[in-house]
């Protein structure tokens, strides 16, 4: 390659003029501003403060800070996605100004005007194209304001496709005007680039690295003698040279002639600064230069053919491997993975003092850590005398003698006359003799001598092939020493180094991948004459290159020449097998993959021990079963289905045993005895019913001698009337006593047959029935496997526990029924109930939490990503509101808006003289004109002179209970009656204190979220208070909403579902209120909090306060009882209207008394109804319950009933509510927190695991009357007007509530109560189908 002429030039600094200084400084500042602007555009966040963002409460995310956020928002608003190109245009303009700063040409104003027109056309058309075809970015239009105007103008005229075409044409014209480029020139340039790319790709595809000649990027005159190389050029090399010349001539048509040598160096796979072309592996073995896969070099050596072993079949005697070992010591190449040791001294012919240089030198390959196996050329004849076992080089480290390194004797120019050298004792092959030559040959050009290799056979291998024989050594003419020139080092080309390093790593991976794994050979056998070259897997890795070279013609002579030396060093390698297991590998093409390990097949005995029955054992097992069966009942036979069922039953029993060993019996003693009796009776009835269904299902075929199945044998159920006779899927808790012999093939038959023979099992179970209570009958039938069989076993109502004791005695199962009576704790929790059925008061033990209150992890977390507020859409909606109000001749300006999770409030500044009532009357018309579901008008906003207009959001967000509970307002509130309602329109949580309400009235239609709101309040108190602080009385007529809380320790009594019990519970609350008032008056306190403080103070003084109102006959206590801390009581009624309509007007008086006086006693009411009518929510109740919550109602009348004002009829439902707090006349709009059923069940289960409820007796029982509070009883006082009303009714002979109401001028409720008292006394009849009553009493006597 010709050397480029360079001249040393001295760099001088020239001073710039003042104008240029200012220009370059200004350009640098503009470029920095463009970089800052690009960072601001890329890091834009809609929540940052900007021109379109009015309120923000978060840290700034933009990298450019607040100015960057403002500027990015403005650019996106104007240009859309084209704003990203503005920094690029700024940098390009700076570059253009810097390049043309020295030009002093005059200014062509016409050209400037054309460029300005072109710039404007490009900007406008680009924005328009983006607006028509691209998606919007964030909440901006894709083309910005400019693109939106163009698109809205062109689409009605030309449609989207026509507008796109028109804008493209204008864009093309603008590009020409701005740049001055002709589109013909642009097309030619694009075509030239495409052709260059295709030419480059096609040449690169056809190119082969191994055929690139070194002369393409090396100067022949400087580095090599061209005439001398052509003298030794072979026919093959000449053919290849001609092909390369033709390819270069073709490439000259498309590639710059000045860059040919650079391209050749780039694609040749060779570094420009390589010193030598010999490729060595990490273990010192030369890589075959003709191996395209591993060497990565040329496959041709066109300079030399006289000594080419491929063309001349000359013996390979060149010591390349020894030279490689020396080179690894001198150069910084990778060390060999396996140890390569020196050859021990052996008496032989001396090594020649000087060796010829390596003639065949490939390009240096990668420094691999594994030896490279070079495949032998195809033209070489294979020698049958040479073969190599694999075991001899497998483990040289385990031998006491240091392994012998294979030695390659050097060869001279005449291989036929060269003697084969062996290492001498006084001069071992160390590598020092070769290092000097290698260092010289590293920088030398390719020599004229051909490398030849001679394989030196190790001493330990010789007895395997043939006996050592003396071989005559032929004289060899010594070659003339070659004067070598040191090749000058060239400067590194770093890009080529990177390419070469990458290829070197790839070749290392390939070499390591295809490295063979030797397999051990147990017994050496002599190699037959018909054996060909050894396999790849049998070649030792140390001599990888030389192991393939026996195909050369001189290998046989070299092997025979080393016979004597090999005999001396025979014990170097041995056939000792390694101690550890050798990996089994599979030979073939590709990586050596280990074969799978051998798997030991278990015997029949082992399979039988695991319960696996082989088909061959079936006959023997059936015979054994029949033999045992004949001992007890002759004639009983079983079919295959029954045998399989019994085997499944046995497996189920074993599984139950393992489950008991895993979980133990730690919770069997926690159940009270009375609960055990009730649960055991219920489970026995379920077992009987399930046995009936199973018998009907499988009663097709019975064994001979079996008695017919009778349900009378299993009649035992005190709760039979309460259970359904339908089939039930049982749920077994797998807890079984550990059995001693789990696998017995005969016993399951007895166990399976028992349910079908009710007579015999009754006789067998007579003795266990007297010893064991009925509770333990579910002690062991818990088998989750094969439910059809295992459920038939517990059909016995009396202790079927021995059914699982049978398999323990395979020979004499009769005594099994005498042994199972072991004192075992009862397990009433093991039931036959379906897992999907809810069971109230379930005693199944749970893991007791360690925290005093439930964790928030039980609730559903809110989503981490919050959708940003679309301020642009809000601005558009504000303008639309103003326009719609103007249509109704109302002038108003939207001064502010408050976006919330569900609705957005727009604050209207009305013009002077405009009344707010006008907007309230237009609420429905505004909803219609704004295309919204509902519009609520807030006439007065506290603290502001504006009118609020609440519109629903397009995308409604869900308010999660967890995010409301995880708030400082809720956590910091010390009251145990703190409840959360949801979020207001500003997104702030709304927290209320039930102790300050003090009672709550909730109303809403079905589906409005009323029950969800009640659940949210209950969960709030469960997350705030312990059972000793707050207790609940829940009344749920629908038996759906509040029944899920059954079993929590906060309950005073079970969830009340009967209306009679509900009235009794309210009466108990009134009596409890009176009792607490007496105690508080005795202690001189005014509320329950003061009472509890007195009790706590007495406890700290260690002087408890005795009950001042206790009498010896009041209770069975032997000592005087003391006062204890009283919890708050919350009475929750889910359907108040149903309670009022079912029980009667008596409940109204009880609720009124509680609402009036119960606040100080710590009793609070939460009444929920879906019918807020005046006959349900009376004036007396409303007067005493000031705090109200209104969900969506059906009409303004209902809204006025619950809130005393309209507005609830325009709510959105699904938790949207109006909350009227205590001492407040203006309701607050709140979006209720959403509670899932899974969350409720999770919290309930968490509290159930903490403890059991301590119910108070007598809450739901009525001691005064058996009929409850449904009507008049003897103890109730008659109305003062009762006698006068009776006289009026008997005289008029017409009984009606309205007549009594008009006659005595009393309220409707009082008149109705008087009529009911008359009905109870028998004066009037019951109300007929038409609503009339008959007067039964005779008329008064005159």
From Swiss-Prot:
<feature type="region of interest" description="Disordered">
    <location>
        <begin position="409"/>
        <end position="489"/>
    </location>
</feature>
<dbReference type="InterPro" id="IPR025199">
    <property type="entry name" value="FtsK_4TM"/>
</dbReference>
<keyword id="KW-0238">DNA-binding</keyword>
<dbReference type="InterPro" id="IPR050206">
    <property type="entry name" value="FtsK/SpoIIIE/SftA"/>
</dbReference>
<dbReference type="InterPro" id="IPR041027">
    <property type="entry name" value="FtsK_alpha"/>
</dbReference>
<keyword id="KW-0472">Membrane</keyword>
<dbReference type="InterPro" id="IPR027417">
    <property type="entry name" value="P-loop_NTPase"/>
</dbReference>
<feature type="compositionally biased region" description="Low complexity">
    <location>
        <begin position="849"/>
        <end position="859"/>
    </location>
</feature>
<keyword id="KW-0159">Chromosome partition</keyword>
<dbReference type="GO" id="GO:0005524">
    <property type="term" value="F:ATP binding"/>
</dbReference>
<feature type="region of interest" description="Disordered">
    <location>
        <begin position="741"/>
        <end position="862"/>
    </location>
</feature>
<feature type="compositionally biased region" description="Basic and acidic residues">
    <location>
        <begin position="619"/>
        <end position="628"/>
    </location>
</feature>
<feature type="topological domain" description="Periplasmic">
    <location>
        <begin position="45"/>
        <end position="74"/>
    </location>
</feature>
<feature type="transmembrane region" description="Helical">
    <location>
        <begin position="163"/>
        <end position="179"/>
    </location>
</feature>
<feature type="compositionally biased region" description="Low complexity">
    <location>
        <begin position="409"/>
        <end position="430"/>
    </location>
</feature>
<feature type="transmembrane region" description="Helical">
    <location>
        <begin position="25"/>
        <end position="44"/>
    </location>
</feature>
<keyword id="KW-0067">ATP-binding</keyword>
<feature type="region of interest" description="Disordered">
    <location>
        <begin position="604"/>
        <end position="639"/>
    </location>
</feature>
<dbReference type="GO" id="GO:0007059">
    <property type="term" value="P:chromosome segregation"/>
</dbReference>
<feature type="topological domain" description="Cytoplasmic">
    <location>
        <begin position="99"/>
        <end position="115"/>
    </location>
</feature>
<keyword id="KW-1003">Cell membrane</keyword>
<keyword id="KW-0547">Nucleotide-binding</keyword>
<dbReference type="InterPro" id="IPR036390">
    <property type="entry name" value="WH_DNA-bd_sf"/>
</dbReference>
<dbReference type="Pfam" id="PF13491">
    <property type="entry name" value="FtsK_4TM"/>
</dbReference>
<comment type="similarity">
    <text>Belongs to the FtsK/SpoIIIE/SftA family.</text>
</comment>
<feature type="region of interest" description="Disordered">
    <location>
        <begin position="346"/>
        <end position="386"/>
    </location>
</feature>
<feature type="topological domain" description="Cytoplasmic">
    <location>
        <begin position="1"/>
        <end position="24"/>
    </location>
</feature>
<feature type="topological domain" description="Periplasmic">
    <location>
        <begin position="133"/>
        <end position="162"/>
    </location>
</feature>
<protein>
    <recommendedName>
        <fullName>DNA translocase FtsK</fullName>
    </recommendedName>
</protein>
<dbReference type="Pfam" id="PF09397">
    <property type="entry name" value="FtsK_gamma"/>
</dbReference>
<dbReference type="InterPro" id="IPR036388">
    <property type="entry name" value="WH-like_DNA-bd_sf"/>
</dbReference>
<feature type="transmembrane region" description="Helical">
    <location>
        <begin position="75"/>
        <end position="98"/>
    </location>
</feature>
<keyword id="KW-0131">Cell cycle</keyword>
<feature type="compositionally biased region" description="Polar residues">
    <location>
        <begin position="690"/>
        <end position="699"/>
    </location>
</feature>
<feature type="topological domain" description="Cytoplasmic">
    <location>
        <begin position="180"/>
        <end position="1342"/>
    </location>
</feature>
<feature type="compositionally biased region" description="Polar residues">
    <location>
        <begin position="437"/>
        <end position="448"/>
    </location>
</feature>
<feature type="compositionally biased region" description="Low complexity">
    <location>
        <begin position="449"/>
        <end position="480"/>
    </location>
</feature>
<feature type="domain" description="FtsK">
    <location>
        <begin position="987"/>
        <end position="1200"/>
    </location>
</feature>
<dbReference type="InterPro" id="IPR002543">
    <property type="entry name" value="FtsK_dom"/>
</dbReference>
<keyword id="KW-1133">Transmembrane helix</keyword>
<feature type="transmembrane region" description="Helical">
    <location>
        <begin position="116"/>
        <end position="132"/>
    </location>
</feature>
<feature type="binding site">
    <location>
        <begin position="1007"/>
        <end position="1012"/>
    </location>
    <ligand>
        <name>ATP</name>
    </ligand>
</feature>
């Amino acid at each position: 390659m010709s050397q480029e002429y360079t001249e040393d030039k001295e760099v001088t600094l020239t001073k710039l003029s003042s104008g240029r200084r200012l220009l370059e400084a200004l350009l640098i500042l503009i470029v920095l501003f463009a970089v800052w602007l690009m960072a601001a555009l890329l890091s834009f966040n809609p929540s940052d403060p900007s021109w379109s963002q009015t309120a923000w409460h978060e840290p700034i995310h933009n990298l450019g800070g607040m100015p960057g956020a403002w500027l990015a928002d403005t650019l996106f608003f104007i240009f859309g996605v084209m704003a990203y190109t503005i920094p690029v245009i700024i940098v390009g303009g700076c570059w253009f100004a810097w390049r043309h700063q020295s030009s002093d040409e005059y200014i062509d104003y016409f050209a400037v005007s054309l460029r300005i027109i072109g710039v404007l056309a490009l900007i406008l058309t680009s924005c328009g194209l983006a607006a028509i075809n691209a998606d919007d970015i964030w909440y901006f239009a894709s083309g910005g304001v400019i693109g939106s105007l163009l698109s809205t103008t062109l689409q009605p005229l030309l449609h989207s496709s026509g507008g796109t075409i028109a804008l493209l044409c204008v864009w093309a014209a603008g590009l020409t005007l701005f740049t001055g480029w002709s589109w013909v020139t642009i097309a030619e340039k694009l075509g030239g680039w495409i052709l260059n790319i295709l030419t480059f790709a096609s040449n690169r595809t056809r190119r082969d690295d191994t055929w690139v000649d070194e002369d393409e990027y090396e100067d022949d005159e400087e580095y090599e003698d061209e005439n001398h190389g052509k003298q030794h050029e072979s026919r093959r090399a000449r053919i290849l040279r001609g092909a390369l010349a033709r390819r270069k001539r073709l490439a000259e048509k498309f590639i710059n002639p000045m860059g040919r040598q650079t391209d050749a160096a780039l694609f040749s796979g060779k570094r420009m600064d390589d010193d030598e072309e010999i490729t060595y592996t990490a273990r010192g073995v030369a890589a075959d230069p003709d191996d395209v896969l591993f060497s990565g070099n040329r496959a041709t050596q066109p300079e030399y053919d006289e000594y080419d072993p491929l063309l001349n079949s000359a013996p390979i005697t060149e010591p390349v491997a020894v030279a490689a070992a020396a080179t690894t010591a001198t150069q910084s190449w990778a060390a060999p993975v396996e140890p390569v040791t020196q050859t021990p001294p052996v008496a032989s012919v001396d090594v020649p003092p000087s060796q010829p240089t390596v003639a065949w030198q490939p390009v240096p390959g990668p420094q691999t850590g594994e030896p490279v196996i070079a495949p032998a050329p195809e033209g070489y004849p294979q020698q049958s005398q040479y073969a190599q076992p694999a075991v001899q080089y497998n483990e040289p480290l385990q031998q006491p003698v240091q392994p012998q390194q294979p030695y390659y004797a050097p060869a001279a120019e005449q291989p036929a006359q060269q003697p084969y050298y062996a290492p001498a004792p006084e001069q071992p092959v160390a590598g020092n003799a070769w290092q000097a030559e290698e260092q010289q040959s590293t920088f030398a050009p390719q020599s004229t001598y051909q490398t030849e290799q001679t394989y030196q056979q190790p001493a330990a291998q010789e007895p395997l092939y043939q006996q050592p024989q003396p071989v005559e050594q032929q004289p060899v003419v010594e070659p003339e020493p070659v004067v070598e020139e040191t090749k000058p080092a060239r400067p590194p080309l770093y890009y080529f180094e990177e390419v070469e390093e990458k290829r070197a790593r790839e070749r290392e991976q390939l070499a390591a991948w295809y490295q063979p794994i030797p397999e051990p050979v147990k017994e050496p056998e002599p190699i037959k004459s018909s054996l060909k070259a050894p396999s790849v897997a049998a070649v030792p890795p140390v001599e990888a290159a030389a192991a393939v070279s026996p195909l050369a013609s001189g290998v046989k002579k070299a092997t025979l020449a080393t016979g004597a030396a090999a005999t001396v060093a025979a014990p170097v390698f041995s056939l000792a097998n390694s101690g550890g297991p050798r990996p089994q590998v599979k030979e073939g093409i590709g990586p050596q993959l280990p074969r799978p390990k051998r798997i030991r097949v278990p015997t029949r005995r082992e399979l039988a021990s695991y319960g696996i029955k082989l088909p061959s054992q079936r006959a023997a097992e059936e015979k054994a079963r029949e033999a045992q069966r004949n001992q007890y009942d002759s004639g009983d036979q079983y079919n295959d289905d029954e045998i399989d069922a019994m085997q499944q039953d046995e497996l189920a029993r074993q599984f139950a045993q393992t489950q008991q060993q895993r979980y133990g019996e730690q919770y069997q003693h926690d159940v009270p005895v009375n609960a055990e009796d009730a649960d055991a009776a219920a489970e026995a009835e379920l077992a009987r019913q399930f046995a009936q269904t199973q018998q009907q299902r499988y009663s097709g075929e019975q064994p001979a001698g079996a008695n017919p199945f009778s349900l009378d044998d299993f009649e035992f159920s005190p709760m039979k009337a309460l259970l359904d006779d339908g089939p039930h899927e049982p749920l077994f808790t797998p807890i079984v006593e550990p059995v001693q012999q789990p696998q017995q093939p005969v016993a399951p038959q007895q166990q399976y047959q028992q349910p079908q023979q009710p007579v015999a099992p009754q006789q067998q179970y007579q003795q266990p029935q007297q010893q064991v209570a009925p509770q333990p009958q579910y002690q062991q039938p818990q088998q989750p496997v094969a439910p059809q069989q295992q459920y038939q076993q517990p059909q016995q109502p009396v202790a079927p526990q021995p059914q699982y004791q049978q398999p323990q005695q395979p020979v004499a199962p009769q005594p099994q029924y005498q042994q199972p009576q072991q004192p075992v704790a009862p397990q009433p929790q093991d039931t036959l109930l379906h897992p999907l059925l809810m069971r109230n008061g379930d005693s199944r033990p749970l893991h007791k939490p360690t925290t005093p209150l439930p964790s928030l992890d039980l609730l559903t977390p809110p989503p981490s990503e919050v959708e940003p507020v679309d301020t642009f859409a809000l601005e558009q909606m504000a303008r639309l509101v103003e326009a719609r109000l103007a249509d109704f001749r109302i002038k108003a300006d939207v001064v502010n808006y408050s976006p919330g999770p569900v609705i957005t409030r727009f604050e209207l500044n009305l013009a002077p003289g405009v009344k707010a009532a006008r907007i309230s009357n237009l609420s429905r018309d505004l909803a219609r004109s704004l295309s919204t579901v509902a519009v609520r008008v807030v006439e007065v906003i506290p603290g502001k002179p504006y009118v609020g207009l609440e519109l629903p959001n397009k995308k409604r967000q869900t308010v999660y209970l967890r995010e409301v509970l995880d708030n400082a307002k809720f956590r910091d509130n010390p009251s145990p009656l703190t409840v959360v309602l949801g979020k207001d329109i500003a997104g702030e949580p709304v927290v209320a204190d039930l102790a300050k309400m003090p009672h709550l009235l909730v109303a809403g239609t079905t589906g409005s979220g009323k029950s969800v709101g009640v659940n949210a309040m209950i969960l709030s108190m469960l997350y705030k208070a312990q059972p000793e602080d707050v207790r609940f009385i829940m009344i749920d007529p629908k038996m759906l909403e509040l029944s899920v809380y059954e079993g929590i320790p906060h309950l005073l009594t079970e969830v009340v579902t009967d209306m009679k019990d509900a009235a009794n519970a309210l009466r108990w609350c009134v009596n409890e209120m009176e009792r607490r008032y007496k105690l508080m008056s005795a202690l001189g306190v005014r509320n329950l909090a003061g009472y509890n403080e007195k009790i706590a103070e007495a406890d700290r003084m260690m002087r408890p306060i005795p009950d001042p109102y206790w009498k010896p006959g009041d209770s069975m206590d032997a000592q005087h009882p003391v006062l204890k801390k009283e919890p708050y009581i919350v009475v929750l009624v889910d359907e108040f209207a149903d309670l009022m309509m079912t029980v009667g007007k008596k409940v109204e008086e009880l609720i009124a008394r509680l609402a009036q006086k119960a606040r100080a006693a710590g009793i609070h009411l939460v009444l929920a109804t879906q019918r807020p009518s005046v006959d349900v929510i009376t004036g007396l109740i409303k007067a005493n319950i000031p705090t109200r919550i209104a969900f969506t109602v059906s009409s303004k009348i209902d809204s006025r009933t619950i809130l005393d004002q309209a507005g609830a009829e325009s709510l959105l439902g699904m938790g949207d509510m109006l909350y009227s707090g205590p001492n407040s006349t203006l309701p607050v709009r709140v979006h209720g927190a959403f509670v899932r059923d899974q969350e409720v069940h999770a919290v309930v289960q968490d509290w159930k695991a903490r403890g059991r409820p301590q119910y108070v007796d007598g809450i739901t029982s009525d001691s005064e009357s058996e009929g409850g509070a449904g009507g008049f009883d003897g103890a109730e006082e008659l109305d003062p007007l009762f006698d006068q009303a009776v006289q009026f009714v008997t005289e008029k002979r017409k009984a009606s509530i309205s007549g009594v109401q008009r006659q005595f001028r009393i309220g409707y409720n009082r008149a109705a109560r008087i009529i009911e008292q008359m009905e109870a006394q028998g004066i009037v009849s019951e109300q007929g189908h038409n609503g009339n009553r008959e007067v039964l009493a005779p008329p008064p006597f005159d």
